[in-house]
């Protein structure tokens, strides 16, 4: 297995950050050594972010953030109370959007559907820098 930790600047706002091109580059560099087949695994080593596979660019990313705001309002109901008001919701996020995903790679290509993208979902406005671990598991 080969693994690489990448840094992602998410800024001080809620974001759905598309990682697909970064993942494609990583897979291209690794897949040639394994006859092109294997598994890409992503992991976010943070308690307040997750990985989602969804359509982007057609408003689905904005819709996801809106749904998360409805499900997890940024208010004072949360027992976890450090950081900005409502920050406790960010610690619940990984229970809904897990901090990991695995995507099969066949013939050196991610087997995503036509409209699928691999995204980092980050609602924590207190932490503008994130990391994502990409791991290549050859077949």
Identify the role of each PLM range.
Residues 1-139:
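Active-site histidine-anchored catalytic micro-motif
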């Amino acid at each position: 297995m080969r693994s690489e930790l990448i840094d992602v600047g998410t800024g001080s706002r809620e974001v759905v950050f598309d990682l697909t091109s970064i993942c494609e580059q990583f897979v291209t560099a690794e897949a040639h050594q394994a006859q092109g087949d294997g598994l890409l695994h992503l992991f976010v080593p943070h308690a307040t972010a997750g990985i989602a596979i969804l359509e982007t660019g057609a408003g689905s990313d904005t819709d996801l953030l809106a749904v998360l705001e409805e499900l997890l309002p940024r208010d004072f109901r949360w027992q976890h109370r450090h950081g900005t008001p409502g920050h406790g919701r960010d610690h619940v996020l990984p229970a809904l959007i897990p901090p990991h995903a695995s995507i099969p790679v066949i013939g050196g290509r991610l087997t995503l559907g036509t409209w699928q993208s691999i995204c980092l979902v980050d609602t924590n406005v207190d932490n503008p820098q994130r990391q994502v671990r990409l791991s290549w598991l050859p077949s």
